[in-house]
């Protein structure tokens, strides 16, 4: 066991983490060059296309060093903020981590968040400066940044190019010499941490585990500690990118895949502990929490008869991703659909894209919202995720909304614009730190509701794509909030309701109705688009009616005849206006996202 090294790679998106993982795999000879597809560790198509790692993957590698055989377990972590819980579980399974920073870009916001998780788990951190082959690489500047922001000594940082293979051998040898072997105790009660789980069509739900203490073997009876359910181990594998390698047992310190013949991933949740029935642990490994949804949106099939197909698709995705929550809801405007909870905005985009791509569904998504805590006058606390569920104003004592701590690293030339944006988003400055004269680190407390709409896009366009951004939830705070309703032709469109700060309600209402005016198709009658708070109309626009020339067939002749026809048309339009229905296009529901 002293020759096992468990390590993971921490990096910001696009800093070359998956490429570096591929280089380490091929250097250890686990895959021949012919079999090497770029990004072996990323298995979902959507991961390769977006260049992001969503699920934590693992691979067991063998390497000979100083005439000794070593086992290297590379545990890949997702780099994106939405998946930080998966990151924390992956890092809890390791003794060390490679901190990969792009030599041309420097330290980014997400890197910092993940490094702090690694430091909390007391991991040995090896700084790795990647992409040194780039013409604009500045190794010394990046070393200074790592020391200044993260406080890790960089005099022994390893410089590599994952693309050309420079420095990879030295990196692997540093992993062996610097990262400690796992502390093991084969006789202690069995404890195995699940740090990833996924669904296989033939084997059912699979759990990727790191054995902390004790050991498990095929045909053992084990217990999943949070559910208290017993299962028999049907098979054990060592993870490998091409085909897993069967094994009869896993000892403490090792990493492997456990097959329990389960139907859903919900039975083996990330962060849970597996223990043996005959050698049972008294308590689980700390830190387990069910993944909590932060951002909610309504998903509706464009063809209403596809509702059951959407339910089946969500059920299947849930097998693989236990963090999604969903429940059926109906909307007067959109029919039947689901209110779906996601870990964050990227997670929402990925899930929507997977539903459309893997299950051939056409979906309308409503504006994303967050959870609000409504304290009622009768003392009751109600939590809502859908603005249309907000109780009447006279029943509300106060409303609390979730806040997040936003960390932003930006070139200093964009600082003024960014501070203006953050102030407009009701942000409160906590910290401002010049890393170098050219780069600034900002910390702000911002309401999550202001971030879920379009904050990320605005941040990127204001800073020409150079700023990086990361956030973590902190607490609920009292806010002066109201519900803004949109009426089209006198009818409330529930899917367009949003909760906004009182001082912004007037301007948001005006922007929304003028955006809607451009989108709502013209009818044969006038259509009023109104924004209201409670019963009070605060903004209005009118979509003019299409004219039909009813007097065209009167040649010359009596003016009263023409007047009679025009009067008749006016009557008809009045009737139509009273009962007319307006079909709203998909863009109308997206217009909510576009307003600032």
UniProtKB/Swiss-Prot annotation:
It catalyses: GTP + H2O = GDP + phosphate + H(+). It is a peripheral membrane protein. Required for accurate and efficient protein synthesis under certain stress conditions. May act as a fidelity factor of the translation reaction, by catalyzing a one-codon backward translocation of tRNAs on improperly translocated ribosomes. Back-translocation proceeds from a post-translocation (POST) complex to a pre-translocation (PRE) complex, thus giving elongation factor G a second chance to translocate the tRNAs correctly. Binds to ribosomes in a GTP-dependent manner. Its EC number is 3.6.5.n1. It holds the Pfam family EFG_C. It comes from Campylobacter jejuni subsp. doylei (strain ATCC BAA-1458 / RM4099 / 269.97). It is found in: Cell inner membrane. Belongs to the TRAFAC class translation factor GTPase superfamily. Classic translation factor GTPase family. LepA subfamily. GO terms for biological process: positive regulation of translation. The gene is lepA. Residues 2-183 form the tr-type G domain. GO terms for molecular function: GTP binding; GTPase activity; ribosome binding; translation elongation factor activity. Keywords: Cell inner membrane, Cell membrane, GTP-binding, Hydrolase, Membrane, Nucleotide-binding, Protein biosynthesis. The keyword GTP-binding applies. This is Elongation factor 4. Transmembrane segments: none annotated. One of its GO terms (cellular component) is plasma membrane. GTP binds at residues 14-19, 130-133. NCBIfam families: lepA, small_GTP. Gene3D superfamilies: 3.30.70.240, Elongation factor 4, C-terminal domain (3.30.70.2570), Elongation Factor G (Translational Gtpase), domain 3 (3.30.70.870), P-loop containing nucleotide triphosphate hydrolases (3.40.50.300), Translation factors (2.40.30.10). InterPro entries: EF-4 (IPR006297), EFG_III/V (IPR035647), EFG_V-like (IPR000640), EFTu-like_2 (IPR004161), G_TR_CS (IPR031157), LepA_C_sf (IPR038363), LepA_CTD (IPR013842), LepA_IV (IPR035654). It is an enzyme of class 3 (hydrolase).
């Amino acid at each position: 066991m002293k020759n096992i090294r468990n390590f993971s790679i921490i990096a910001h998106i696009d800093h070359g983490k998956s490429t570096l993982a591929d280089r380490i795999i091929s250097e250890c000879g686990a895959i021949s060059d012919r079999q090497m597809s770029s990004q072996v560790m990323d298995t979902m198509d959507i991961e390769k296309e977006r260049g992001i790692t969503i699920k934590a993957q693992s691979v067991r590698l063998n390497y000979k060093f100083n005439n000794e055989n070593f086992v290297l377990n590379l545990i890949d972590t997702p780099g994106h903020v939405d998946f930080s819980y998966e990151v924390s579980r992956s890092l809890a399974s390791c003794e060390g981590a490679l901190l990969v920073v792009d030599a041309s870009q420097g330290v980014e916001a997400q890197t910092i968040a993940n490094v702090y998780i690694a430091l909390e788990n007391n991991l040995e951190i090896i700084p790795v400066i990647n992409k040194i082959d780039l013409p604009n690489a500045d190794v010394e500047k990046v070393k200074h940044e790592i020391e200044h922001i993260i406080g890790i000594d960089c005099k022994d940082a390893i410089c590599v190019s994952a693309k050309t293979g420079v420095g990879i051998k030295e990196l692997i040898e540093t992993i062996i010499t610097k990262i400690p072997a796992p502390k093991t105790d084969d006789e202690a009660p069995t404890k195995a941490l699940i740090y990833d789980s996924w669904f296989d069509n033939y084997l059912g739900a699979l759990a990727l585990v790191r054995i902390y203490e004790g050991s498990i073997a095929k045909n053992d009876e084990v217990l999943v500690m949070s559910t208290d359910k017993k299962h028999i181990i049907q098979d054990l594998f060592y993870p490998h990118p091409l085909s897993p390698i069967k094994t009869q047992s896993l000892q403490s310190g090792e990493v492997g895949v456990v097959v329990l013949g389960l139907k859903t991933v919900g039975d083996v949740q990330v962060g849970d502990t597996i223990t043996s029935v005959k050698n049972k642990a008294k308590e689980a490994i700390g830190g387990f929490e069910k993944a909590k949804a932060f951002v909610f949106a309504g998903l509706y099939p464009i063809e209403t008869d596809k509702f059951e197909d959407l339910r089946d698709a969500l059920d299947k995705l849930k097998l693989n991703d236990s963090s999604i929550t969903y429940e059926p809801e109906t909307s007067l405007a959109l029919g039947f659909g689901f209110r779906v909870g996601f870990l964050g905005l990227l997670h929402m985009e990925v899930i929507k894209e997977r539903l459309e791509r893997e299950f051939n569904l056409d979906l309308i998504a409503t504006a994303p919202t967050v959870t609000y805590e409504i304290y009622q006058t009768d003392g009751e606390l109600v939590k809502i995720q859908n603005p249309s569920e907000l109780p009447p104003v006279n029943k509300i004592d106060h409303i609390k909304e979730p806040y997040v701590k936003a960390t932003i690293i930006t070139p200093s030339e964009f600082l003024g614009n960014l501070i203006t944006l953050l102030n407009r988003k009701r942000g409160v400055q906590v910290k401002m730190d010049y890393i170098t004269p050219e780069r600034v680190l900002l910390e702000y407390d911002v309401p999550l509701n202001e971030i879920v709409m379009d904050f990320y896009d605005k941040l990127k366009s204001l800073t020409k794509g150079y700023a990086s951004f990361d956030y973590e939830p902190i607490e609920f705070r009292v806010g002066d909030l109201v519900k803004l309703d949109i009426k089209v032709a006198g009818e409330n469109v529930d899917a367009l309701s949003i909760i906004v700060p009182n001082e912004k309600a007037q301007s948001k209402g005006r922007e929304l109705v003028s955006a809607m005016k451009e989108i709502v198709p013209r009818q044969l009658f006038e259509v009023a688009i109104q924004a209201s708070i409670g019963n009070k109309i605060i903004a209005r626009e009118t979509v003019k009616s299409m004219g039909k020339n009813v007097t065209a067939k009167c040649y010359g002749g009596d003016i009263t005849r023409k007047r009679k026809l025009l009067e008749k048309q006016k009557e008809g339009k009045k009737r139509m206006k009273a009962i007319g229905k307006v079909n709203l296009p998909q863009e109308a529901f997206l217009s909510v996202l576009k307003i600032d």
